[in-house]
Amino acid sequence: MASGLVRLLQQGHRCLLAPVAPKLVPPVRGVKKGFRAAFRFQKELERQRLLRCPPPPVRRSEKPNWDYHAEIQAFGHRLQENFSLDLLKTAFVNSCYIKSEEAKRQQLGIEKEAVLLNLKSNQELSEQGTSFSQTCLTQFLEDEYPDMPTEGIKNLVDFLTGEEVVCHVARNLAVEQLTLSEEFPVPPAVLQQTFFAVIGALLQSSGPERTALFIRDFLITQMTGKELFEMWKIINPMGLLVEELKKRNVSAPESRLTRQSGGTTALPLYFVGLYCDKKLIAEGPGETVLVAEEEAARVALRKLYGFTENRRPWNYSKPKETLRAEKSITAS
């Protein structure tokens, strides 16, 4: 021991201060780390499986925490409308649902007297709601666009009451989750009928004034950001323009090429102007002269009908729903 101490003193004081190199211990994978890796792997496999084969949609009523009566009550409160609960429940019952449930009871061998369900179809409410909606929308649009012809008003009403727009509104109002239908997801035609049945229930519950407000808030707003001829499909805009100018005792328009660019390239651009009595009434672009002329005719029609891009927004602050609703209910 003494000899080792003497040898250490001979090496100097630096050796005493030298740090001892730690031993490198190979990492050991613990049970917890292995479990986490396996859990992440299984989770990724499940995610990829759901992406490849997504599960079929499930009715909300087949999931836990569902109370149909409470959901019906909450529907009216959510929309801030006063519905009669019996009418609202009837509005969500479709004839296809009644037939399918009665067929299931027959397959179970239930007697014929007990097979019939004590439910009423929403057919009558849907017809009332459809008729009132079309009449009310016609009154709204005629008041807002007095220069638009009857054909244009009818096309706008058909667009707003069409399957695509109505189903979009109905899904965002959770009408689909409350609809009693044979199939799920609910077919567009059935969903459209159910939405108009809800309008019919509101008409009988709260009167035409509140129903007109409902139609204004949820259907008229679907015109926001839409161009006139997206909703009204016309084949011959120049012919329609000539007819409209003739009604106003204005001479037929003359088309002239005003500007062009890249005529010899793959992407040419032409601007055609329409002149009446030597005055430019509209100008439109297009990849050919004919397309530019048709676009100029559409621009002129928008100006005539008051449906330009910079038109005044719809006035929601001071509606005249009382007068319009009275007209609608009288006409329907």
Swiss-Prot record:
Recorded GO CC terms: mitochondrial inner membrane; mitochondrial large ribosomal subunit; mitochondrion; nuclear body; nucleoplasm; nucleus; plasma membrane
All copies of domain RNase III, residue ranges: 86-228
A single GO BP: mitochondrial translation
Main location: mitochondrion
InterPro entries found in the cross-reference section: dsRBD_dom, Ribosomal_mL44_DSRM_metazoa, RM44_endonuclase, RNase_III_sf
Molecular-function GO terms, alphabetical: double-stranded RNA binding; endonuclease activity; RNA binding
Record key words, sorted: Disease variant, Endonuclease, Hydrolase, Mitochondrion, Nuclease, Primary mitochondrial disease, Ribonucleoprotein, Ribosomal protein, RNA-binding, Transit peptide
Enzyme Commission identifier(s): 3.1.26.-
Keyword Hydrolase: yes
Associated disorder: Combined oxidative phosphorylation deficiency 16: An autosomal recessive, mitochondrial disorder characterized by hypertrophic cardiomyopathy, liver steatosis, and decreased levels of mitochondrial complexes I and IV in heart and skeletal muscle.
Family per similarity comment: Belongs to the ribonuclease III family. Mitochondrion-specific ribosomal protein mL44 subfamily.
Its job: Component of the 39S subunit of mitochondrial ribosome. May have a function in the assembly/stability of nascent mitochondrial polypeptides exiting the ribosome.
Protein's recorded name: Large ribosomal subunit protein mL44
Organism, scientific name: Homo sapiens (Human)
The gene coding this protein: MRPL44
